[in-house]
Amino acid sequence: MTADATRICVVIGRTRHKMVAAEIREAGKRGAALIELRIDFVARAPDLKRILAEKPCPLIATIRRPQDGGRWGASEDARQMLLKQCIVSGGFEWVDLETDIADKIRRFKSVKRIVSYHDLAAFPPDLEDIYARMCQQDADVVKLVVAAQSPADNLRMIEIMKKATKPTIAFCSGDLGFPSRILCLKYGAPFTYAAFNKERGVAPGLPSFDEVLRIYHPERINAETRVYGVVGDPIGHSHSPLVHNAAFKECDVNAVYVPFRVTRGHLPQFLDSFAAVPVEGFSVTIPHKEAAAQAAHTKDETVTLTRAANTLVRKPHGFFAANTDYPAILAALSASLTRPGGPPLDMHKRMVLILGAGGVARAAAHALHKAGATVHIANRTIERAKKLADEVSGEALDWTARHKDSCDLVINCTPVGMHPNIDESPLHASFLRPGMVVFDTVYTPETTMLIREAKTRGAQVITGVDLFIRQAGAQFELFTGREPPLDRMGQVLRRAISPVTLHDED
C-alpha cells in the first residue's frame, strides 16, 4: 500500500495476544503510521512485552470501560493501574484517558495524552460545556465521540472543531455520524480512526483502514477542501464515494465526497442545515429523488420532464437540480448503437420495453420517448406502470405480461439480478434474441444473469457499470466544470465490484 496513512489511527482490538501482535505487524506492512491498541479486548492479563516486541510505529494505549463503548471487565482500580503500567513501559507514545480520570493520572516523560469523552447512547445537550472543561485538562489532544441521533448532529461536532482551542478530534458514531469521521480532518483533527479489521466490531460505524485510505484519501483533506456527497437511505452500500473521490484525485481537485444517510421525508431540513459546511453538491439516490426535484430552486429540462433529480448543485441562491440518468442512458445507447462520425441516435419506430417504474425507469422512459421510441412499461405494481406510461404516451403491462410482445430494446430498471441474488433474471432467456439490445441498469455484478443470457442468445448488451459511470461523470462535470476522467472512474468501480477486490490503489 503506497498511500499516505499519516492521518489515520488504526484501531486493533483482539482477544488473543498472538492475533494482536500479528495485526500490529500487518498494519505496519500496510503503512500504518499510528496504532491504537484496545487493551480492553485482550482476554487475559496483557503481556505488554510480547505485544510490543515488533511494533512498527507509535502506539496509543487505550483501555475502554463498557460505559464508554469498551470491553474492560475488571475493576476500575485495576484498569487505572494497567494504564499507568502502559505509560511507564516505554512502549507507548500515547495514552487515552477518559475525562473523568485524566486528572488522576499524571503526565509521564514524553508520553502524549488524549483526553476523551464517549457517549455511544445519546447526544449530550451540554456537549459544548463538556468540551470546554476538557480543554482545561492536561491534554495534547481532546477527543469527543457521541452517538448521532440525526444527520444534523454532525454539524454540532463540526462547530466544535471550528472553534477548537487545542488539537481536537470530534466526530459522531454510527452510520448517521460517518460524515464527521472524515470531515473532522477538514477542520483540523490531527487524525481520524479506522479499524484494522472492520468485521471485529470495535466501535459502531468505524470504517476500515483500507476503506478510509482507498476511498477518502485523508492526506489530501485540508481547510480548503470542498465537500460533496451522496444522500440516501440506505447508503452504506454506495460506490459513489469511491468513484467520485477517485475522480477528484485523478484531476487534482481539492474536494472530498462522503455518504450522508438521510431518512425519507427529511431531505429539505438536511439541505438547510448543511448549508453551514457548506456541502457544494449532492448525488441523490433512493428515496429522495422526487424530494430533491421539489427542493431545488432551479432545475434543468430533465428534472422538469421526470419530476425527479439525482443531482443537486449549490448555487448562490439555492440548489440547481439535474437528472444525469437521462443523458447517461442516451449516451450509453448512442455509444452502442451508432458509429463515430455517423448519424445520431434515432429511436423512431423502435419498440422499447422498460422493466420497473422507479427513478431510473422514469429517466429512461422520458429520454426514449423524446428520442422517438414507443415505450412499454412493465411493473409489479400496475398502477405505477400506468402512471409512467401515461406520461410518455406508452403502454403499461402487468408484470406477468412482460414477455407478451417482442421489442428492439429492453431496459431492466429493477433490482432483479443484483448481488446477492445473482442467479435471478427479470426475463426468460427465450425472450432474448439476436439483434435485440439488452440494457441492464444493475451494476453489482456487472455481468448479471440477464447480461449473460443476452450474450448467449446473440443480443447486444449494455451494462449497469456503463450507465453508472456516465451518470457519475455528468455529476462530476456539474460539480467541477471539468471533463470527467471516465476511464479512471470505470477502473476503480470495476475493481471494487469484481469477485476478487484488490486494495493496492495507486
Role assignments for model-derived ranges:
Residues 94, 100-226:
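Catalytic alpha/beta core domains of metabolic enzymes, predominantly
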Residues 225-339:
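Phosphate/diphosphate ligand-binding glycine-rich loop within oxidoreductases
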Residues 436-486, 490-492:
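Rossmann-fold NAD(P)-binding glycine/threonine-rich loop
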Residues 5-125, 146:
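Active-site beta->alpha loop and helix N-cap motifs at the rims of alpha/beta catalytic domains
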Residues 390-461:
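Rossmann-like adenosine-cofactor binding region
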Residues 172, 227-235, 321-326, 333, ...:
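Glycine-rich adenosine-cofactor-binding loop
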Residues 35, 371-392:
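NAD(P)-binding Rossmann-fold cofactor-contacting core
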Residues 59-104, 291-341, 345-347:
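Glycine/small-residue-rich loop that forms an oxyanion/phosphate-binding "nest" at active or ligand-binding sites
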